Amino acid sequence: MQLIGMLDSPYVRRVAISLRLLVLPFELRQISLFREVERFRSFNPVLKAPTLICLDGQRLMDSSLILDYAQHLACGSRQLRPSGHAARATALSRSGLALALSEKAVQLVYERDLRPEEKRHAPWQQRVEGQLRAACGALDKAWLGPRPPLGEDSIGQDAIDTAVAWTFLHFALPGLIERRNYPTLEALAAEAEALSVFRDYPLA
């Protein structure tokens, strides 16, 4: 399989790390949607990252759909989400918050880097930033309390998504969110980023 996209995307990075943990062989092809548009288009004319090219040539888009397919391919040899109803709902809630955090951070980056200043709409930016801060607060609260140490044989999708989102936020929008205000997220991300699988797929 081939995974198309840059690791500076939280969506590409969460997929790459998860595929490795699921022991699914793949080739990462870091092709930029912005600097190599025509090259990316040759793999996916929709220009959406990540794109996964399956062994039979089918192309999958959307990181969550790709991971659903990947978990099916893994055939239960490694589960990134708990099977119990309550535990699974908790994990999905955390992942949802982490993905919302990523989405709002990406929106703010696009506003800053792609939209001309005279066309930016301040109320919209304030709304998105408010959503981002709400996601940070809710996600930090969702991880409060004791938890087992993170290891490559035990880390779940919710922790992967949380760490990837938190790291991306501070890489892409430095200084916007005070790290010290979210100590639970800061500690979890630091622990996850120390794992070799995270170091093998660095943000930059």
Regions found by a protein language model. Give the residues of each.
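Short, flexible loop/turn segments with low-complexity composition
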Residues: S83, S154, D200-A204
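GST-like fold's C-terminal all-alpha helical module
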Residues: A98-A187
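Hydrophobic/aromatic-lined pockets within catalytic cores
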Residues: Q71-C75, Y110, H170, P174, ...
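Non-transmembrane alpha-helical segments in soluble domains
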Residues: L67, Q71, L92-S95, C136, ...
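GST-like domain detector, emphasizing the conserved glutathione-binding G-site
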Residues: M1-A122
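C-terminal end-helix/capping segment
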Residues: R180-Y201
